[in-house]
Amino acid sequence: MKAKKNAQICFISSDTRDLYAEDIFRVMAAPESYIIKFRYRYELIKEVNRIKENMDVIIYSLVGTHSDENKLELIPIRKAKIKDIEKQNDFIEYYLELKEFVILTSENKKIECEKIPQKIVSIITDKNLEVEPCLWEEKVEELFALDNNNFRDRLMYKIEKLEVRKFCERWKNVPLKGKNTYVCYSNSDYKLIINLKKSSDKKSSDKNYILNINCDKDILKDILEFISLDAPRDKVTNRFYTGYFNTDQRYSQLIFRNPPQKSEVENSNKYDFKINIKLKKRKFYSILFGLLIGILTAVTKYNGIITFSKVWNKSIPEIIDYSFLPLIIGLISVFLFHKYDKK
């Protein structure tokens, strides 16, 4: 049975637990097309069999759950598409590809408490939940304006872009079991662009907002260790590069962390957001090396330095005698160089 045309599939994360609040920070921080995983018990899902792959959904944040229930607010955050569903004995996992940020339409400024869905995942047709696209900055301002929540006390950020500076290569997103893997290559320059914004509240103006970035410094070089935001908002561009490595491919992670400003809260949740990176050796140098070896072999053979037909005293067709041997030697050189290059 299909959902009606005007029906909306809602995925709701509340602020009752740090784990749920972290989901919203990840949704706010993730770049376009990032795959995020939500894992629920079956009893938290309404009409589970109606929710299928490739359906469009909207991710909501339910705030105010620590205070009076009459002050509950349901805030639409971002659109997404269901890319995969994995059913287990007690749980079901949804893999959502993130799309644009959204806001309630001008006619629906607020969702009444009694109309808030009672299940974490629901299909509803209430016109009061109609949304329209908005900018990331607008969504951040909406979250900062809320009462009884911890958004205002943290630096909000979004990974705007991961792009390659050389060879016009682009980072590729591989949605495998919710793990977002961006592919880059050895000895290459890359650019990381991050949007940042802090609350304009007077109480927050004198605070130092920091975004920590952790990674393997031996693989990803010149990545900023942290970004300190003094202005209300900023866009930071960090150029970094990858070095040489011995194996055909390696894996690493970029871990972004925005700790709360209230330092008196020991071991408070730092809300990690992770991006997996797969590094591959460039085959360009191997191919170039093999090509040069093949050309040198052909030249020396043409000059009579290497002549297998004379050595074995056999009649070999000229096209094979002068072309095939350099080709074979070149291919072997490519393989050996790529396999054992230790730079």
Question: What is each of the regions a protein language model found here?
Answer:
Residues 166-200, 206-212:
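Contiguous beta-strand segments within globular domains
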Residues 93-178:
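Contiguous surface segments at macromolecular interaction interfaces
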Residues 228-249:
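Short, hydrophobic beta-strand segments
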Residues 312-328:
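Hydrophobic alpha-helical transmembrane segments
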Residues 1-43, 177-182, 187-191:
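N-terminal "first-domain core" detector
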